[in-house]
C-alpha cells in the first residue's frame, strides 16, 4: 500500500466545486467524482473530515449586498452547506464509505450536532465526517470553519480543493495571463499580499496553529490522493 504523508486531513470543498461547469446547484457527475476520490483516500487508512461551502446555492455576502440583514443572509448560507453535505454523504454511502454529517446548528432529524470528541471518535473508526452549517455563527466563512475544525480535531493538513485554479497565483489566472503561480508561500505572504487564498481570519487561525494548507485543482481526478501522498501539486502554504 502507498504510504500517505498525512494521516488526518480536512478537505475544504467550495460550493462551486460541487456545481461543476454549470456554476449553480449540485451536478451529480461532479459530486460522484469527488466521492470516488475521497473513497480512494479513505482506502489508504487516512482519516478524512470534509468542510463544505454553500456558494453554489446561496451566498450570504450576495444577500447582504442586496440589502438583506447580514446575519439572516449568512444563516441561509449555512443551510445551503447542509444541503451540499447531505448530497455528498449520499454519494459516499452509495460507494460503501461510512459517513457522518455533523452540523453547527442543531437539526437532529437530518444530522448529528457538532461534538468535537464524537467527531474524533468517528474519524478513529475510519468514518468520513462532513462538517456543515459553517461555525454556526454569521460573519464567519466556511474557510474559517475549515481552519477551526482542523485545529480542533488536530488535523495534519487542510486540503483546499478549487475548481477554477490549480494553486495560488499572483493574480487571477483566468483574467490576467501574466499571473505567476506560487509553489510555496507563508501565511504572512498570503495575508500581506492579499492573495485571496482564504480570508484573513482563516489564514490567521492556520498560522497561529501551524496547520499547513495545500491549494490544488479538484477537476483533475486523483488529485486529492496525490495531495495526501505528498506529491508536489498545487501550492503549499505554511508557517509565518
Swiss-Prot record:
The keyword Transferase applies. One of its GO terms (molecular function) is ATP binding. SUPFAM superfamilies: Carbamate kinase-like (SSF53633). It catalyses: UMP + ATP = UDP + ADP. UMP binds at residues 54, 74, 135-142. It is an enzyme of class 2 (transferase). ATP binds at residues 12-15, 55, 59, 163, 169, 172. Its EC number is 2.7.4.22. Residues 20-25 are annotated as: Involved in allosteric activation by GTP. It comes from the Bacteria. One of its GO terms (cellular component) is cytoplasm. One of its GO terms (biological process) is UDP biosynthetic process. It holds the Pfam family AA_kinase. Allosterically activated by GTP. Inhibited by UTP. Pathway: Pyrimidine metabolism; CTP biosynthesis via de novo pathway; UDP from UMP (UMPK route): step 1/1. This is Uridylate kinase.
